[in-house]
Amino acid sequence: MKLSLTTPKGALVDTDVEEVTAPGDLGELGVLPGHVPLMTALRPGVLSYKAKDHDGIVAVGQGFLQVAPLPRAADAPARDRVLVLVDQALAAADIDREAAARELAQADKELAAWRGELDGAYHALVLRRGWAQARLDAVARAPGAAH
């Protein structure tokens, strides 16, 4: 399978993979070769993938995931493409754990004190909290992380 993970700033991952796990809106979603075509919403969380020579851990924001067959020549084997479009993403190795922890604590404090409507501002705060938690979770799941 071909995994392409893109943000508005550009491509973060573009590699052949054997497996992808992503944070779907309804729960964690696993994709293996031959998966049925689908499109689903993603929530902030951890996307992981297994390639032949390495594994990857990426914190992702909200977005979409699509699984579809790649175009191919008549004599070529079938391959799938996993396209991930998210508003933000960071490889686990590039995450500042302390900054994410501070942002999570601040978002939790603001949510606990929230007395306003459950409107766009509230939704933005929930997403900010989710992004901070996603980064902390990615760091915790990265190889060599202290547990």
Report each predicted region and the residues it spans.
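Absolute protein N-terminus
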Residues: 1-2
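Acidic/glycine-rich phosphate/pyrophosphate-binding loops and surrounding catalytic core
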Residues: 75-78, 83, 89-147
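Compact, glycine-rich, soluble single-domain proteins
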Residues: 6-106
